[in-house]
Design a protein with these regions (language model features):
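Short carbohydrate-recognition loop motifs
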Residues: 61-79
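Secretory/extracellular carbohydrate-interaction modules
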Residues: 77-142
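Short, aromatic/His-centered strand-loop micro-motif at the edge of beta-sheets
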Residues: 143-166
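Carbohydrate-binding surfaces in secreted/extracellular proteins
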Residues: 160-191, 316-326
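Short, solvent-exposed beta-strand-to-loop segments that form ligand-recognition rims
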Residues: 181-200, 326-339
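Aromatic-lined ligand-binding clefts that engage carbohydrates, nucleic acids, or primary amines
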Residues: 306-320, 364
Length: 394
């Protein structure tokens, strides 16, 4: 559905041992299937009536396992069910869901419009209890779903296909906790990454949904302040960058380093966010086809030498140090053979290279091309001894 997940993220493959663990746990949970949805803890069920919901084309109100429900079909994944006359800021959202396809249903909250919202969704496979990407939080920012540059915001869950599953979200300020079928929180988001503070609530499919409850203000003591960035005191991360305007890059072409912007006025600061992520999507939104930006920074070295650097990016990268190319690679989820660990997501596991430094200032320039979902970069030195990291002003 255009307003929720225009391109639902595909699914990962996992090692056989993890799959067996997931199947075993899922089978144990499924041994006593729920004939009716589990009772929610607070609030009143919102009936699926025209005065309460705007249902997109193809969404039907049904009775399923003895309760009123809606079915959002696979064919209508780009259509959503929107709750009317609700502006949600903080509180609890609960619902029961039965998946009809591993693609899974999604919940949008703080929905300003189709391009800016917070999103929680499920990839409801039988191995969900072992799969690191069974559930995920990711925001839409400027029309881009940032799922592939935020792999740390996904998790396994006790989700079971072909029966009711109870999902509960508690939203408080910049924090989010998610429970699936009770127990401990399956997902704890220390800092929400979207740009909306309040907005609507809606669902996309495919799936069957029932017992939707919204309890404004019920945050269960969850601190609204964001949790700490675990990398904040790590001096190895390159965080201060300047970014160029966006240019198009023809398919199959490589960027011309000599044609990067030369005038200082064409570059603007783009500091790294949490965990050292340089979020290009937040600045420029959805690329129009294969697009390129340049990022640059200065590394000042006390003496000439070489540092090892870990790098994460989506989708293509070229690294230049003092005008010489030292690294290039591809991390493209669309082509399984070109996916870097972890499964095509942006991570410092994507790659590493030798960073040659001369004594004094060294200009590091990185070209990053993208045409698919999130667009970003991370760079971290293995050892920051003898270097000073600053943004380039040249």
């Amino acid at each position: 559905m255009d307003t929720m997940a225009p391109r639902q993220p595909p699914f990962s493959s996992f090692v056989a041992s993890a799959a067996l663990i997931g199947v075993a746990l899922a089978s144990a949970i499924a041994a006593s299937p729920q004939a009716t949805p589990p009772a929610a803890t607070a609030g009143a069920v919102i009936p699926f009536t025209p005065d309460r919901w705007e249902l997109g084309e193809g969404i039907t109100v049904i009775e399923h396992r003895g309760v009123q429900a809606i079915r959002i079909p696979q064919a209508q994944r780009r259509v959503e069910a929107l709750l009317k006359n609700v502006v949600f800021t903080n509180g609890t959202i609960e619902f029961d869901v039965e998946g009809t396809n591993p693609m899974g249903p999604a919940l949008a909250f703080r929905r300003r419009d189709p391009k800016d919202l917070e999103l929680f969704y499920l990839r409801g496979r039988p191995t969900c209890a072992a799969d690191v990407d069974c559930i995920q939080y990711a925001p839409f920012v400027k029309g881009v779903l940032l799922w592939d540059i935020l792999p740390e915001l996904q998790a396994p869950a006790r989700y079971v296909p072909d029966q009711w599953n109870h999902v509960k979200l508690v939203v408080s300020g910049q924090r989010l906790k998610v429970w699936v079928n009770g127990g401990a929180p399956a997902l704890d988001v220390a800092r929400l990454r979207g740009e909306t503070k309040d907005g609507g609530i809606g669902f996309s499919g495919p799936g069957i949904l029932a017992n939707v409850k919204v309890t404004p203000g019920a945050v269960e003591g969850l601190d609204p302040k964001p949790g700490p960035d675990p990398t904040a005191k790590d001096s190895r991360y390159v965080r201060a960058w300047m970014v160029s305007p966006v240019t198009t890059l023809a398919e199959g072409a490589t960027p011309d380093f000599g044609k990067r912007p030369m005038a200082t006025a064409e570059w603007t600061p783009l500091p790294a966010e949490t965990a050292g992520l340089v979020n290009i999507s937040r600045r420029y939104g959805l690329p129009d086809g294969r697009s390129l930006v340049w990022l640059k920074t200065t590394i000042r070295a006390a003496a000439a030498g070489e540092k090892r650097a870990a790098i994460g990016w989506n989708d293509e990268v070229w690294v230049f140090v003092n005008g010489k190319q030292v690294y290039a690679d591809v991390n493209d989820y669309r082509k399984p053979e070109l996916r870097k660990k972890p499964d095509g997501r942006l991570s410092l596991e994507n790659g590493s290279f030798a960073l040659p430094l001369q004594a004094g200032d060294n200009e590091v320039v990185v070209g990053v091309a993208n045409a698919f979902f999130g667009w970003g970069l991370m760079l971290r030195l293995d050892d920051a001894a003898g270097v000073t990291l600053t943004a380039s002003s040249r």
